[in-house]
Amino acid sequence: MTLVPAIGRELSNPPSDGISNLRFSNNSDHLLVSSWDKSVRLYDANGDLMRGEFKHGGAVLDCCFHDDSSGFSVCADTKVRRIDFNAGKEDVLGTHEKPVRCVEYSYAAGQVITGSWDKTIKCWDPRGASGTERTQIGTYMQPERVNSLSLVGNRLVVATAGRHVNIYDLRNMSQPEQRRESSLKYQTRCVRCYPNGTGYALSSVEGRVSMEFFDLSEAAQAKKYAFKCHRKSEDGRDIVYPVNAIAFHPIYGTFASGGCDGFVNIWDGNNKKRLYQYSKYPTSIAALSFSRDGGLLAVASSYTFEEGDKPHEPDAIFVRSVNEIEVKPKPKVYPNPPV
């Protein structure tokens, strides 16, 4: 019997440069991975098998699935691509004016949504033929460069540089439903919507995560809070690490955070508790994704150049089996009432 290390099984054939994102399919244990080595790769995470690879004209900054064997990728070469691993075929949906940082596919709207450093969000209809004039639905100006996107149902959350957060309804993109400022004082690294659709978690470069709610009523806003994480004390000094990644568990609504300290923590946001911390990974955590049933967690251990160019551990993808005890909220224990 092969003993699986505590940090999970390492996949063979990893990218040769920084990993920008990884995502599990909604239908299987297929894993889509984008990288600065200009590649998008499709793995079978269970069988440790690379099923296919596309090479693009620049660093690939994000990717997402459409169905089990096709998806979308966005690139520093400004292009938005549709990629089909079964057919071995790619085509360009369109372009931005600057590198494209993030991509999401909305199953609710049947649209691809991209965010770029050109300070725009664009929506595309992937069913159209190739060519911008046939596939582009709309362009929406943002206050700053787009750093992170997240979708839940018809809601789109856009986090930009300058700590801006815009919240849209995909059915009416003419203007944001809400314009907000991040509750955190420093640059946003990642935004992810709660699976139940009530709000979003947002992480910053300064070792913090904030828990936010869409409902603007006083009662709902009273529930929002922020907490410190991915820090350590050394010689009386607090060393603070960027929190690069957030991933919600699809069943329990708890979430994982990954930081430049090489740690992955599991949190129960409702009860404001850390449930688990995994053993340290070789380098920074660049991205995280739970499988569709929450039974696997994919971890990109990949230096994110937060300390500039320096020797670092090789970029690697680990797939870890998730034990229910690590992710299931613990029931609140109430003291027995006096007799």
Curated annotation (Swiss-Prot):
Single biological process term from Gene Ontology: meiotic cell cycle
Disulfide bonds: none
Subcellular localization: Nucleus; Chromosome, Centromere, Kinetochore; Cytoplasm, Cytoskeleton, Phragmoplast; Cytoplasm, Cytoskeleton, Spindle
Consequence of gene loss (knockout): No visible phenotype.
Keyword presence, Cell cycle: yes
Function, as annotated: Has a dual function in spindle-assembly checkpoint signaling and in promoting the establishment of correct kinetochore-microtubule (K-MT) attachments. Promotes the formation of stable end-on bipolar attachments. Necessary for kinetochore localization of BUB1. The BUB1/BUB3 complex plays a role in the inhibition of anaphase-promoting complex or cyclosome (APC/C) when spindle-assembly checkpoint is activated and inhibits the ubiquitin ligase activity of APC/C by phosphorylating its activator CDC20.
Protein's UniProt name: Mitotic checkpoint protein BUB3.2
Underlying gene: BUB3.2
